[in-house]
Structure formats: structure tokens, C-alpha cells
């Protein structure tokens, strides 16, 4: 339940799906086909004007420059008309993109918080284990030493204090483990 995204009114609408740049280009080309047509007409007029200039035909060159201006005007009108026609759809798309961005930011934030919680839990568990080990070590250190017999004292006097076996951390943990069972 926690991993599922919240339902959205735009979720089932195929018009508002995330799209790649190529898909966006194709969609815009289908929505406003007059703009690329005007750009192509402008480029063709410039090409013809260039060819006329190379040929030395100034009359044809002037006609093509005028045609270029008309083609640019047509392109500009197509841009303005398309902008007015698709204004509401673009606003909806911007709102959808904002929602997608907010959802991604929220998912990133939630993942970060989950990771922090996991780290905090691991740290808390480690501290508890460390405290238990410390307590077991202190308890093992407080145990009274076994009473020595006089014969053992003579034999032990040859053993240096550094060679004596002391209770280590592993023994303390083992003792703690046995007490819990």
C-alpha cells in the first residue's frame, strides 16, 4: 500500500503520459503542421534566391526574396494561431509536468527518508549490542577471583601476570548469550 502512488485524475488519460523528446517533436509536428511547412517554404525561397543570384538574374532573385518574406509571415501567423488554438492544452500539459516533477521529488525525498530510517535503526541496534557487550564485560570483571590453594600459588608465582588468562570480550558475550537462554 505504501509503495503504490496516489491515484491521479490524469493517470488514465493517454494524452498526459511522459514522453521522450522525439515523441514530443512528432506530437508538435502533428499538432501544428503549418509551422514546418512555412519553414520549408522560407528555406526553398532562400535557396531559389541564392541560385538566382549565382545565375545573375536579379529579377528572379528579388521575387524569391519577396517570397521568403511572405513565407516567414505565413510561418509567424501559423505560430500565433497555433499558440492561441492550443493555449488551454499547453496549460494543462504544464500543470501535468509540474505534477510529475513534484511526484518525482516526493519519491526521491521518501527514498532518502527511508534510507535515513534504516541507517538510524542500524545505528540504534549497534549501540544496543555494544551496550550489552559492555555490560557483560563489566559484569565479568566484577566477578570475584577463585580462591587459590597454597600449592597453586607456588606454581603460579612462576607465571607472569601478563601470561595469565583474563576474561575477554568473546567470553563476556558468550556468558551474556547463555544468560538470555
Curated annotation (Swiss-Prot):
Cytochrome c oxidase subunit which plays a role in assembly of respiratory supercomplexes. Keywords: Membrane, Mitochondrion, Transmembrane, Transmembrane helix. Residues 6-97 form the HIG1 domain. It comes from the Eukaryota. InterPro entries: Hypoxia_induced_domain, RCF1. It comes from Aspergillus fumigatus (strain ATCC MYA-4609 / CBS 101355 / FGSC A1100 / Af293) (Neosartorya fumigata). Belongs to the RCF1 family. Residues 134-154 have a biased composition (Basic and acidic residues). It is a multi-pass membrane protein. This is Respiratory supercomplex factor 1, mitochondrial. It is found in: Mitochondrion membrane. Associates with the respiratory chain complex III/complex IV supercomplex. It holds the Pfam family HIG_1_N. The chain crosses the membrane at residues 33-49, 69-86. Its main location: mitochondrion. PROSITE patterns: HIG1 (PS51503). GO terms for cellular component: mitochondrial membrane; mitochondrion. Residues 134-161 are annotated as: Disordered. Disulfide bonds: none annotated. One of its GO terms (biological process) is mitochondrial respirasome assembly.
Amino acid at each position: 500500500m505504501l509503495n503504490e502512488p496516489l491515484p491521479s485524475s490524469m493517470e488514465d488519460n493517454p494524452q498526459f503520459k511522459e514522453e521522450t523528446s522525439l515523441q514530443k517533436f512528432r506530437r508538435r509536428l502533428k499538432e501544428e503542421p503549418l509551422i514546418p511547412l512555412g519553414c520549408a517554404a522560407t528555406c526553398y525561397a532562400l535557396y531559389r534566391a541564392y541560385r538566382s543570384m549565382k545565375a545573375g538574374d536579379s529579377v528572379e532573385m528579388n521575387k524569391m526574396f519577396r517570397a521568403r518574406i511572405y513565407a516567414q509571415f505565413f510561418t509567424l501567423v501559423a505560430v500565433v494561431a497555433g499558440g492561441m488554438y492550443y493555449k488551454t492544452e499547453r496549460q494543462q500539459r504544464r500543470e501535468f509536468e509540474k505534477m510529475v516533477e513534484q511526484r518525482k521529488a516526493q519519491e526521491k525525498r521518501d527514498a532518502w527518508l527511508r534510507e535515513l530510517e534504516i541507517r538510524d535503526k542500524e545505528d540504534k541496534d549497534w549501540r544496543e549490542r555494544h551496550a550489552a557487550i559492555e555490560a557483560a564485560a563489566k559484569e565479568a570483571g566484577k566477578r570475584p577471583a577463585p580462591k587459590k590453594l597454597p600449592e597453586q600459588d607456588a606454581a603460579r608465582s612462576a607465571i607472569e601476570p601478563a601470561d595469565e588468562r583474563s576474561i575477554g570480550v568473546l567470553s563476556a558475550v558468550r556468558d551474556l548469550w547463555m544468560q538470555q537462554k
